Amino acid sequence: MKQKRGKQDVKMVESAPPQLLPKKGRLEISELAPQQRTIRTAEEIEMAYNEAVRKHPFYDNADHTIDFHDATVFRDARGVVGGVLLPGALPAFAATMAADVLRPAAVRTSLRSNMFGGFAPLSGIAGYFDYRGSPVELKCRKTSFTYENVHSWPNVFPMIDYVSAIYKAVFPERWAAQDAAVPDIVRIHGSPFSTLTVNQQFRTASHTDAGDFDMGYGLLAVLEGKFEGLSLALDDFGVCFRMQPRDVLIFNTHFFHSNTEPELNHPKDDWSRLTCVCYYRAALGEPACVAEYERRLARAKEIGASPPPAVDAILQKDNGNNFNKPAPTFTYSLTPFGGAASICSLHCCTAKLLRLHELLLENPTLEVILFGESLRTDDGLPRREKEQLISVHLPVVVKMSPSGGFSELGGALKAAEEKQYFFEEKYLADELGPDLMSMWTQSRAHWLRLVKEDWERLCRRDPERTKFTWNNSSAMNAAFFDLCEVAKQMMIGLLNKETPSSAENHSFWILFAAHLNYACTTENGMPRDAVGMHKLNVKLKDFHFGGTRYLKDMPPEEQERRLERKKRIEEARRRGNAARETHTDNWLLNDTFDYQQEDRKVEFEENGWMTPEAYVKHLGLKPCGDVTAAASPTEPIHVLVVLPRPAAAAPKDVKRDVPLATSEESIRLLMNPAAQRVLTGKARNVTLPSPLSFGGVKITVLFDGDDIDCIHPDFVVLQHLLAAIEEDEAAKARVKYWAHVARYCVFVVETDVRDRRHFLLREEVRVAYEDVAEDCFRSLHAAAYSTKCNRLRTTPSLIALSNSKNIGLRFKFRGSPLNTIALIVVGERLD
């Protein structure tokens, strides 16, 4: 980009925690709000949900066949890349710096409620946006969040630079096309991205990202969080990408995608997740926006704007054809071999895996030989009824606390304690005028001093005391109400509006209380909960409603003094607002040519950080090449299937020990047609089949423990072997052993005793299932393999046996009567 002025070099530093920013809704912090902030009837909630999911349904993990865990390149049936998963690809410091800036960008917005079951999610945009179809009069410019956070915005740049370098390394041609199309004045820090979408605790329903550049990809980065599940799913393809903080996913945002359910032990458990999607908003390169840039530039030159424009002229680039429609999907039947072919660490054997994938599709009977059952069973475990599952949004309606107090339910108190630093002076100074900041500092210090004096007096009477006694007629109480008056004006000043919303009130006052409670501990040396959040909450409500010894009960001269004090506080707040309104209040009216004024150079080496170019080399990233063809039918491929050794032959007249199917759950598990075939059929490991050959493909079947001196397989399939091994260490040793035997990888095929919709089951259904599941699956396993079933495990425990770092993917056998899964364990990465 041609510049009239040089870029300003600045040393990048770790950004401070997010400030309470002066934008509507910025104080609506999800962790601090009650579980439901508005009152809606059950009928209204149901109606909104049904309307939303009619167009944008939610899909659960059980609705998808493959969960990718490791670095992956997933392609459609025509070989076009749909998604590239890169675990841990984003440097930790860059993720943290970006999170600290972008966290407040995610605000409650009804604009995306159709993707959240009719509820307003926490979501926002940063960078540049066209505002096409929006009532905002001035288009094609910085988002309000970027405008209001221009000073901290450069701390996002390291993340942007790394993500851009990753994109360029993996898809150089797509990166170049996107880079060539994006107008220079709306690109974020020289990247091919114009816009960021920031989501917080947002499980999206199925959707496409209309408006993204058709010839490029979007890049999803998980910046921070404590969560399990919430995989990014490509819904039409039946695949999920499991992600954790610092993971990056490059994917076609024009495919329908969504998030699977959060995996919580209890529906009300706390979880957090902050993500950022980087993309080019194609409308910013269309003629209408280019005309807007030209108009603003001409005006800036006419008035001699200072600082001067970053460019001399606006160039209309070739923006390609952007249809804002879902991309065509070319799906194919999924198999464990086809899924494994997508795993990057198995690229050396991709051709062989694709040959096995083709062979399975050509000969479906091989599924039973290799895995013990078909990949899909239509009459097996039936799908759960809607009534057995919890709602996406819990049907809990909590009445909002009156303004001035806060709800003490759920995880709000814990979240407030973690964020109490919002009220520290260094984070408020830039948002409030000096007069109001001085009042806050002095009032806070005065109240803390009086609290300390009262506490020391109480402790002299009782040295073992742990709780503070609040005297409603004390000077400390009066100082607290005075401090609340200052805080109230701070809230109005921060939000820049006289009437904050209920959620903003709630978030502000719970943070305020958490900060004071923390200060009593750290500055006054009091026990952690000596004052306590509950007591502060009660006093805040006293303040709001004119409680004991407040204004209406005070002598006339004291009332007059306090009213005068309140007036001075309001004036201080207004002076502070006036001082900053040129930067914050005027976003709607901002008609300047301020594009790229926020750009700064990132001093990577000065800060001791790897440059993006060096970093992608460090990661070993290479361009996604052409589609790998399946190996020729004559190429030698050896698959070894290992079965559990059967128990000693039992008399034919001895009946199998099958539990009675008396409960609804046991009937579901044992009485479906596929389960009945298992219970009445022949065991799969009574006799070993002879080796099979299909051209160059050889399949050998043997028992665990047999001599394998002359066998050197490419792939090993362990067919329900671990269920016969009770001790985890022994089971882990068998997986490790067979992983060393396999030239490439091992397919661990086992029963998952956990219900596929475990995290969605109503509590009573989950309890009923868990009461009978183990006994039922033991019977099914004994019938299928004629061996004692010593230990059934869940997916997490099976992953633990194989070392989670070695897991490439999980494949779920659809409708399997044994609830079978296959884990791909990459042998070459084992110790």
Swiss-Prot record:
Purpose: Dioxygenase that catalyzes the first step of DNA base J (beta-d-glucosyl-HOMedU) biosynthesis by converting thymine to 5-hydroxymethyluracil (HOMedU). DNA base J is a hypermodified thymidine residue found in the genome of kinetoplastid parasites, which is localized primarily to repetitive DNA, namely the telomeres, and is implicated in the regulation of antigenic variation. Also specifically binds to base J-containing DNA (J-DNA).
Any single Pfam family the record assigns to this protein: DB_JBP1
Family assignment from sequence similarity: Belongs to the TET family. JBP1 subfamily.
Region of interest called Thymine dioxygenase, as start-end residue ranges on this chain: 80-282
Site (Involved in J base recognition, conferring specificity towards J-DNA): D542
Protein known as: Thymine dioxygenase JBP1-B
Cofactor stoichiometry and binding remark: Binds 1 Fe(2+) ion per subunit.
Gene: JBP1B
GO terms under cellular component: nucleus
Entry annotated with the keyword Oxidoreductase: yes
Subunit field text: Monomer. Binds to DNA as a monomer.
